[in-house]
Amino acid sequence: MNRLKEKFQKEITPALVSKFNYKSVMEVPKIEKIVINTGVGDAVSNSKALDNAVEELTQIAGQKPVVTRAKKSIAGFRLREGMPIGAKVTLRGEQMYEFFDKLVSVSLPRVRDFRGVSKKSFDGRGNYTLGVKEQLIFPEIDYDKVSKVRGMDIVIVTTAKTDEEARELLTQFGMPFQK
C-alpha cells in the first residue's frame, strides 16, 4: 500500500473527524482524482510538438494521456474544430497517490523561488487547481531531451464539501501552502 494512502487511513482520517466533528468516517473528504492537462499551442503548425508533450506527460503520470481537440474553430489562432491542441491524463487509485506523493515531496520543492502554493486556488467546491510553469520540475524529465519548456495544470479533485475541508485535507497530506 502506498505511503500516503496508509497515512490517510491511520492519521488523517481520525484528525479530520475530530476537527470537523463528522458523525461517520465516510463523511471524511478524500482525494478522488488528479487531472493533469497541458495545452500545446504549437500543435496547430507542428504536429511533432504534440507527440513530445504526450511523451512527457506519459513519463510524468505513468499513464498514457488522451489527446484533447479544439471544440470550435478560431480564425485568429488558425485553429479548426477537431484539431489536436493538447493532452490530459486522469489519475485515480494507486497511481494518483504515487503522483501526489512525488509532486509534494520531490517536484514542488524543485520549483525556483518556491515559497509554497497559493491558498486561493480552490474553486469553492473543494477542488484545488495548481499551475506548473515548466515540466522540468519532475524527476522523470531529462533536461537534455526537452525540446520546449511547457507548463501544465494539475487539478486535485476531492470529495470535500467546502474549501476549508479541502485545504485541511491537503495540508494534512503535506501540501506546502503559503504562510
UniProtKB/Swiss-Prot annotation:
| Keyword hit for tRNA-binding | yes
Q: Which residue ranges traverse the bilayer?
A: none
Q: Is rRNA-binding given among the entry's keywords?
A: yes
GO cellular component terms attached to this protein's record:
ribonucleoprotein complex; ribosome
Looking up InterPro entries in the UniProt record yields: Ribosomal_uL5, Ribosomal_uL5_bac-type, Ribosomal_uL5_C, Ribosomal_uL5_CS, Ribosomal_uL5_dom_sf, Ribosomal_uL5_N
Q: What GO MF terms are annotated?
A: rRNA binding; structural constituent of ribosome; tRNA binding
- Gene3D superfamilies xrefs: 3.30.1440.10
Keywords in UniProt for this one? Answer: Ribonucleoprotein, Ribosomal protein, RNA-binding, rRNA-binding, tRNA-binding
One Pfam entry for this protein is Ribosomal_L5
GO biological process terms held by the UniProt record? translation
Extract the HAMAP family matched here. Ribosomal_uL5_B
Quaternary structure?
A: Part of the 50S ribosomal subunit; part of the 5S rRNA/L5/L18/L25 subcomplex. Contacts the 5S rRNA and the P site tRNA. Forms a bridge to the 30S subunit in the 70S ribosome.
Q: What function is annotated for this protein?
A: This is one of the proteins that bind and probably mediate the attachment of the 5S RNA into the large ribosomal subunit, where it forms part of the central protuberance. In the 70S ribosome it contacts protein S13 of the 30S subunit (bridge B1b), connecting the 2 subunits; this bridge is implicated in subunit movement. Contacts the P site tRNA; the 5S rRNA and some of its associated proteins might help stabilize positioning of ribosome-bound tRNAs.
The Swiss-Prot or TrEMBL record describes its family as follows: Belongs to the universal ribosomal protein uL5 family.
Q: Please state what the protein is called.
A: Large ribosomal subunit protein uL5
The species this protein belongs to is: Bacillus cereus (strain G9842)
Question: Source organism lineage?
Answer: Bacteria, Bacillati, Bacillota, Bacilli, Bacillales
